[in-house]
Amino acid sequence: MLKAAITTLSFLASASMASAGSLNYFVTNLVSDQPGVAQITDPSLVNAWGISASSTSPFWVSDNGTGVSTLYRVVGGVVSKVGLTVSIPGDGSVTGQLFNPGAAGGAFNGDNFLFSSEDGTISGWRGSLGTTAETLVAGSSANVYKGVTYGATGGFSYGYAANFRAGTIDVLKGSAGAPTLAGSFVDPTLPAGYAPFNVENINGTLYVTYALQDSTKHDEIDGPGDGFVSTFDLNGNFLGRLASNGPLDAPWGLALAPSTWGTFAGDLLVGNFGDGSIDVFNPANGMFLGSLTDSSGAPLSIDGLWGLDFGNGKNGDVNTLYFSAGPDGESHGLFGVIAPVPEPGAWLLLTGGIGMLWLVRRRAV
């Protein structure tokens, strides 16, 4: 009964806040490697980077600092850790990850999830592998993969990896018979010194973020205005520049807000690793619409912000934005949620709901 009450309250509050169209948001930490910082503590969650999920699975999170991927369920605003922890091969410097819808057809050895790493390794996991992912592409000093996404075109599965060192989008074939894609994934107007930092397939369009390379072409250089976002089709043909400089600061996280997400419904959210802000753009014409702000109206900032993802409805609310981060210079980790600040009516709902939960708890004693 108590669990049902919590779930009902969370759903009603979420629905009320999503429809309110609020411009202000607040952050709730769900998981941290540091005790007392979030709902639960998980020492494996260090420099939490990429996030992925199937339509029904828990959240899979890349833990760059510990070389594993950890799994979390979020139901009714309450998070729990799944028993499975997957070790990533190579040096374990895992960054982005993807869910592979083509696994049932044998794409990528039937691996359900794929992972990119900074040592150039691409790895994959399926249930029969147990707690260790397999190597699909061996590591190489020529490659520094910061992100990866999935796409299907011409009846074949492909992976698209952001190679920060080489300055390319590297295409991974899901099967040996897949044809080579015709496009080059080149933005012809991109300034020298910038390289693909992340890539995300959103409704069949590939969005590529670019950050400024350091002298070793391994890490990004943060700074106001240092970033670009361009779009390509699944064959690698350049579609156009979506965003340039302005509020961008080493952009990495990408997510499309659902149609029910208030003022920014249907807009592209771009998370900046550099300053931790989240910018909003019209996904069709690139118009800058503003940035998420906190309860005081100041720009919302999450230290070491990496991934952005909405829930799938089975795990995590579809109207709720989840994030991963590597705060304190990537030495710690966070997995959390960003939600609209409730309007007065929603606060009354929450207050009444808290009273209901208190009554339920008393009756349960």
What are these regions (language model features)?
Residues 1-6:
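Bacterial N-terminal signal peptides that target proteins for export
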Residues 7-15, 355:
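Bacterial N-terminal signal peptides
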Residues 18:
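An N-terminal RHG(E/S)-centered segment typical of histidine phosphatases
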